Amino acid sequence: MVAGESVISSPYAGQETREIKALSTKDIEGLLSGAGTPYGGMAKPAELNGYPGPRHVLDAVSAGEFEVTLEQREKIESLFESMRSQAIVIGEEIVELETEVDVALAMRTITTELLRENILEVGQLYGRLRLVHLETHLSMMDIMTEDQVDRYNRLRGYTSGNPCDNIPKGHPPEMWKKHNNCS
């Protein structure tokens, strides 16, 4: 029998070579850079309910697709950097704890106590990370006008009523459809 043909073949096959088994390379990079990964976006509920993300606004401004005043831009940049610096610290802690668990599992030195402590701490850290990202989106509402928020949401493709029918420019269609539960 060939691997993958068994009734117990694993969707994790191939991931056993990861540096940290619980995290993909993209997840690790995102955590260490302060991005809103993993889990498909730490601020996804805010984003999909019309609360702009500072990184996306700044990207749209840089691309000439969106206008903000100089004062708004400075506030958005400051907000983004504050969020990013907090997220990096939390992300580094998550990666460190996940590494400890992975190493202990690999060396067969894991204890229930270490496992419990690290996993519970990782859970709390992910909660803090989500909060940092979500609060940042909420703070954007104090910086942007209602018209700007409406324009942002149109640029992001959140106005069709059916996100599966309106994939925003620059978004990979497969990833967009996956994140929006399109069939």
List where the protein language model places each region.
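Charge-rich (acidic/polar
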Residues: 2-183
